[in-house]
């Protein structure tokens, strides 16, 4: 690229952010654009229009990932920027969208200002990056990390299948197998993202240069006891599944301290009790356990510690314990060269980081 400093149109970028935020916004001001829902499809149509208006080459692959290409040459490795525009229920308006829209503005401004490029640029909005169907469908498809079995097994929390949801929007989920890109086709990938935590704010820093992507394990855990009348079953004679869950939740901090690292986190984000009546001892507690770290060895140690702790609690309380691995992603270190480039650029603009 030439040394000319890129000038972006911030009012235009702000207008795009506000326009996208209006799609799928509910009365509670949260945004509901779950993958392949009506809100998501409306947002995708809006983005396609903006890509075309920007003079970029519009492309959609078999996994329904959307691309806007500048100076496209299939024989040259490209620099890819972007994120996603699908959301979790009740999302904020910048999660994912900021990376896509800032990427759009950058490519649009480069084209308008006639900046010469050494290699092609691609804007991408990945499909189902928020994991409605367990995983990160669009980016995993691009990496060749899905199979026909995965596609047909993928379901959301309501039981709807990925193939069914995509078919309702005129899309064929099995076409995602054609979306795989070779590593040689990409020179670099850069994503701008809001911080989804308090660290930068607490430090008073404007920018965080990401060192790596945490690995993740997500389990569907079930503790099974005996449902009995809450008024007539003595405490010492109960096999209370919720008490087992409660004891395990208290143990999480200890397990992280003893077996985790400085960046380890673990969360119980969903709990279901059966039969779910106020006057019945819970006979089943089912919950989602998710834990993350930057080191694969730490994730292994945490897995072992969580499993052993749950087994011990179950034995002590007269419960049965089983779990299913719902999702598993390996940790990845970010490229040192790109990190240094982002850091030096931040320093040149006097951004504390």
Predicted segments with their positions:
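Glycine/charged-rich beta-loop-alpha catalytic/anionic-binding loops adjacent to active sites
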Residues: 28, 77-90, 224-230, 349
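Catalytic-core environment of secreted peptidases
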Residues: 54, 66-98, 103
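Flexible, glycine/charged-enriched surface loops at secondary-structure junctions
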Residues: 61, 116-117, 176-180, 254-268, ...
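A generic, well-ordered mixed alpha/beta core segment in the N-terminal half of proteins
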Residues: 87-158
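Midchain, well-structured core segments that form catalytic/ion-binding scaffolds
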Residues: 128-297
């Amino acid at each position: 690229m030439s040394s000319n400093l890129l000038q972006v149109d911030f009012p235009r970028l702000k207008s795009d952010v506000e326009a996208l935020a209006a799609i799928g916004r509910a009365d509670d001001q949260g945004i509901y654009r779950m993958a392949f829902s009506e809100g998501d499809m409306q947002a995708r149509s809006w983005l396609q229009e903006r890509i075309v208006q920007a003079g970029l080459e519009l492309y959609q692959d078999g996994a329904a990932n959307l691309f806007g290409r500048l100076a496209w040459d299939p024989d040259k490795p490209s620099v890819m920027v972007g994120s996603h525009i699908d959301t979790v229920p009740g999302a904020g308006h910048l999660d994912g969208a900021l990376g896509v829209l800032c990427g759009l503005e950058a490519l649009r401004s480069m084209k308008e200002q006639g900046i010469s490029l050494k290699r092609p640029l691609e804007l991408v909005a990945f499909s189902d990056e928020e994991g409605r169907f367990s995983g990160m469908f669009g980016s995993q498809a691009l990496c060749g990390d899905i199979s026909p079995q995965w596609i047909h097994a993928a379901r959301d929390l309501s039981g709807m299948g990925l193939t069914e949801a995509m078919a309702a929007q005129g899309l064929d989920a099995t076409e995602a197998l054609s979306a795989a890109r070779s590593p040689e086709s990409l020179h670099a990938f850069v994503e701008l993202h809001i911080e989804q935590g308090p660290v930068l704010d607490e430090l008073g820093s404007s920018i965080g240069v990401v060192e790596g992507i945490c690995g993740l394990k997500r389990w569907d855990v079930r503790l099974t006891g005996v449902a009995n009348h809450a008024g007539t079953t003595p405490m010492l004679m109960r096999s209370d599944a919720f008490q087992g869950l409660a004891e395990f939740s208290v143990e999480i901090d200890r397990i992280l301290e003893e077996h985790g690292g400085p960046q380890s986190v673990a969360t119980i984000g969903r709990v279901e009790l059966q039969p779910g009546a106020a006057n019945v001892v819970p006979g089943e507690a089912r919950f989602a356990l998710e834990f993350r770290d930057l080191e694969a060895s730490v994730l292994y140690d945490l897995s072992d510690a969580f499993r052993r702790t749950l087994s011990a609690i179950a034995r002590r309380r007269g419960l049965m314990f089983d779990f299913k691995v719902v999702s598993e992603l390996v940790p990845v270190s970010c490229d040192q060269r790109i990190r240094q480039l982002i850091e030096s650029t931040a320093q040149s603009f006097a951004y504390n980081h």
